């Protein structure tokens, strides 16, 4: 099994940890992926991870967002243990998420409805949500494709 090598690209004066892993372990079946992982990411810090395929880099992001849960250990966000928060509650309360390497969208929904799906998790006011969606569509010059299903968009359009 390979090793994940975390590194700090830029560290600022603020040392308040916003994400912390304490003795986190995870297995897929009989295969141990993470074994008592400990690290923290401080507020305003730029942080990265390097490692060969299959050592758990994407798994760590899935654990942070709550898409999967650890076998052992604690995951903390802003000092609060979040192991038992469901993904949608974690996303809403802590305003976290990430775009996976192969896209974070619903293929059969339009661009507009993909944004709406995210907005329904993070914004309580439907009028404000629609205003925000329209603002983003306009800002990224996507008006002419807002009703096209995500599976028909180019790679660059999906990234926007």
Each language-model region and where it sits:
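Conserved ABC ATPase "signature" region
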Residues: 116, 127-145
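Conserved ABC ATPase signature
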Residues: 149-153
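ABC ATPase nucleotide-binding domain "signature motif"
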Residues: 154-160
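The feature captures the beta-strand-to-loop junction immediately N-terminal to the Walker
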Residues: 47-52
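Conserved structural motif at the start of ABC-family nucleotide-binding domains
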Residues: 19-21, 34
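Conserved ABC transporter NBD signature motif
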Residues: 73-83, 91-94
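Q-loop/switch helix immediately C-terminal to the Walker
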Residues: 102, 108-121
């Amino acid at each position: 099994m390979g090793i994940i090598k975390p590194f700090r690209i830029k560290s600022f004066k603020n040392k308040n940890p916003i994400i912390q892993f304490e003795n986190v372990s995870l297995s897929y079946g009989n295969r141990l992926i993470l074994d008592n992982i400990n690290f923290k990411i401080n507020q305003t810090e730029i942080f990265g991870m390097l490692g060969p395929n299959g050592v758990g880099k994407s798994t760590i992001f899935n654990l942070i967002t709550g898409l999967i849960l650890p076998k052992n250990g604690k995951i903390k966000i802003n000092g609060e243990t979040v192991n038992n928060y469901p993904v949608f509650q974690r996303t809403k309360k802590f305003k976290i998420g990430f775009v996976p390497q192969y896209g974070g969208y619903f293929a059969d929904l339009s661009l507009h409805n993909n944004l709406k799906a995210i907005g329904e998790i993070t914004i309580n006011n439907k009028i404000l949500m629609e205003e925000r969606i329209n603002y983003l569509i306009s800002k990224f010059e996507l008006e002419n494709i807002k009703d096209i299903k995500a599976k028909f968009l180019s790679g660059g359009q999906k990234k926007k």
